[in-house]
């Protein structure tokens, strides 16, 4: 492709609202243009990258046995009402009416649509299993669209859905799709980790996220420094501490702590280590009027997903009201503890072996020092209540945990019968008995993959595309293409030979200054660059550089095509 026939629109500066490197570079490189908050046009250069990602995805979906179809963006409300998600999904679901006053929505996912198709088309175990996928535009009415296409309202996703006669079949397909995702992200040249994850609003049981490692990632993942264990930090379990409890050394003493309502202010006021403090979280119990007290170390982060699964705790997790707290404890938040509390108490594993804690005294403006479980209050039930921290023992018993930030680009779920039961997606088994199908779903954020790749592959000059994702594999930058016959002839010859060799080449024949052409080639991140100028041609050479290291080399003009094609095929 010649640049004069293509469309290149680059900027020297990124818009002020762009925070992430990917957002800045995608705007500057002209990959996307903003139309409204969270809405973008994919320009020709960006669309080429998007199609490269889609091609890899399609190839690996076919290899995994998934069949492509295309479902609508606009979906009828009755399907969502049938599954129960019409109200549950909330304001992120963009609802609309047609001219006949019928309700529809812009689909953020397609579980309901595919379930409806399958229940109408498949009725026998002989037709199972089946695995379908599509690549389609989605819409979620985000409250605060931000970070460019990383969290846009409109985006492109690959969704796959599988249907099965039994769980064993679902597990087989789940494993195959998991492997396919690993191949996809490996082929795209991304550094990633598959991690055990929570199922969230999609529902179901087994779940894995595929996280591209990047400092700008919103998610935190925990992984073993020894084994292959990895999980989202919200799901990684902590283990009970080993050994005996530290012997109590101090007496229980009530101390006056005026205006001390946070762990930070408590540590400062008493001049104690934060690890010696306990914080109290009060949540509603399953039964009306009941509350449950949760205790964890002051320096640890409370995990509401784990807490919600505890026996006797209301689901969804609901914090107790200030009035209920005062009624039960006689004090306000910031001064609470287990002494004298008769209700259910859970304490985190990390507190079980400790002694002489500092805890709220259930009187405003007072705390206890020297608090010990079993002596000053009944032994609580010790459970996992917190997020893991770096250095914790790996849940598989192998090594210690490390933490890294990641960007979720894919997610696979074992939905089981969450949707098939609600929508009566059934089949006749080999005994002629009606059974509910097992279901899996598997998503990849195609547009998000592009942004995540840039977050992982950029420098001060611009994007550094991986081999599989580059808009073009090679850019030819001729100096004075319009004015120098020698340069133009050499550029056209190399361009034709590279095209004949099957390379994806951009010949930048724009009538621009050399600095503009060179800067744009670096900003656009094309992996291989050939610069052609009169001076080098007089010596029989062209200048060649790979974008990742930017080390320019003089290569004989007769050898450049072989050199580049060898690199492309490596």
From Swiss-Prot:
Q: Please state the protein's primary subcellular location.
A: cytoplasm
Q: What is its EC number?
A: 6.1.1.15
List the subcellular locations. Answer: Cytoplasm
Swiss-Prot/TrEMBL catalytic activity: tRNA(Pro) + L-proline + ATP = L-prolyl-tRNA(Pro) + AMP + diphosphate
Q: What's the superkingdom here? A: Bacteria
Q: Name one GO molecular function term.
A: ATP binding
Q: Which UniProt keywords apply?
A: Aminoacyl-tRNA synthetase, ATP-binding, Cytoplasm, Ligase, Nucleotide-binding, Protein biosynthesis
Q: Does the keyword Aminoacyl-tRNA synthetase apply?
A: yes
GO annotation (BP), single? prolyl-tRNA aminoacylation
Q: Which InterPro entries match?
A: aa-tRNA-synt_IIb, aa-tRNA-synth_II, aa-tRNA-synth_II/BPL/LPL, Anticodon-bd, Anticodon-bd_dom_sf, Pro-tRNA-ligase_IIa, Pro-tRNA-synth_IIa_bac-type, Pro-tRNA-Synthase_IIa_type1
Tagged with keyword Protease: no
Q: Oligomeric state and partners?
A: Homodimer.
Report the function annotation for this chain.
Catalyzes the attachment of proline to tRNA(Pro) in a two-step reaction: proline is first activated by ATP to form Pro-AMP and then transferred to the acceptor end of tRNA(Pro). As ProRS can inadvertently accommodate and process non-cognate amino acids such as alanine and cysteine, to avoid such errors it has two additional distinct editing activities against alanine. One activity is designated as 'pretransfer' editing and involves the tRNA(Pro)-independent hydrolysis of activated Ala-AMP.
Which HAMAP family would you find in this protein's record?
Answer: Pro_tRNA_synth_type1
Name it: Proline--tRNA ligase
């Amino acid at each position: 492709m010649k640049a004069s026939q293509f469309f290149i629109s680059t900027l020297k500066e990124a818009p002020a609202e762009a925070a992430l490197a990917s957002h800045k570079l995608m705007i500057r490189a002209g990959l996307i243009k903003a139309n409204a908050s969270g809405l973008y046009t994919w320009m020709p250069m960006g669309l080429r990258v998007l199609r490269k990602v889609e091609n890899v995805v399609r190839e690996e979906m076919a290899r995994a046995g998934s069949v492509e179809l295309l479902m609508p963006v606009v979906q009828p409300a009755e399907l969502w009402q049938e599954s129960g998600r019409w109200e549950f999904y909330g304001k992120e679901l963009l609802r609309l009416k047609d001219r006949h006053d019928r309700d529809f929505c812009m689909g953020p996912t397609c579980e309901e649509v595919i379930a409806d198709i399958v229940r109408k088309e498949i009725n026998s175990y002989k037709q199972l299993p089946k695995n379908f996928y599509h690549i389609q535009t989605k819409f979620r009415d985000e409250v605060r669209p931000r970070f460019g296409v990383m969290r846009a309202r409109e985006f492109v996703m690959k969704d796959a859905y599988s249907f099965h006669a039994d769980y064993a079949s679902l597990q087989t397909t789940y494993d195959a799709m998991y492997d396919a995702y690993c191949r996809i992200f490996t082929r795209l040249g991304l550094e990633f980790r598959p991690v055990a994850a929570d199922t969230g609003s999609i529902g179901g049981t087994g779940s894995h996220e595929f996280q591209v490692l990047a400092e700008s990632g919103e998610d935190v993942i925990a992984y073993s420094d020894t084994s292959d264990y990895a999980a989202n930090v919200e799901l990684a379990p902590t283990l009970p501490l080993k050994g005996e409890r530290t012997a109590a050394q101090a007496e229980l003493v009530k101390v006056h702590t005026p205006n001390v309502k946070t762990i930070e202010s408590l540590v400062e006021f008493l001049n104690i280590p934060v690890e010696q403090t306990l914080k109290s979280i009060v949540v509603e119990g399953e039964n009306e009027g009941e509350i449950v007290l949760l205790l964890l170390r002051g320096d640890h982060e409370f995990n509401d997903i784990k807490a919600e699964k505890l026996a006797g705790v209301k689901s969804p997790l609901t914090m107790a009201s200030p009035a209920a707290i005062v009624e039960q404890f006689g004090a306000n938040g910031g001064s609470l503890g287990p002494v004298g509390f008769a209700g259910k108490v859970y304490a985190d594993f990390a507190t079980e072996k400790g002694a002489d804690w500092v805890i709220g005294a259930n009187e405003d403006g007072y705390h206890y020092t020297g608090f010990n479980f079993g002596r000053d209050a009944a032994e609580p039930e010790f459970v996992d209540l917190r997020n893991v921290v770096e250095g914790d023992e790996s849940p598989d018993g192998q090594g210690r945990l490390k933490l890294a930030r990641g960007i979720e680009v894919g997610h696979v779920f074992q939905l089981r019968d969450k949707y098939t039961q609600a929508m009566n997606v059934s089949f006749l088994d080999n005994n002629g008995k009606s059974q509910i199908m097992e279901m899996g779903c598997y998503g990849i954020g195609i547009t998000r993959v592009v942004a995540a790749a840039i977050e992982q592959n950029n420098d001060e000059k611009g994007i550094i595309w991986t081999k599989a994702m580059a808009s073009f594999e090679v850019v030819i930058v001729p100096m004075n293409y319009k004015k120098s016959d020698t340069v133009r002839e050499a550029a056209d010859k190399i361009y034709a030979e590279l095209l004949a060799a099957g390379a994806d080449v951009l010949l930048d024949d724009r009538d621009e200054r050399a600095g503009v052409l060179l800067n744009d080639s670096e900003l656009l991140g094309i992996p291989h660059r050939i610069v052609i100028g009169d001076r080098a041609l007089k010596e029989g050479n062209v200048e060649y550089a790979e974008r990742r290291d930017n080390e320019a080399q003089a290569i004989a003009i007769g050898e450049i095509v072989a050199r580049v094609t060898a690199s492309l095929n490596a």
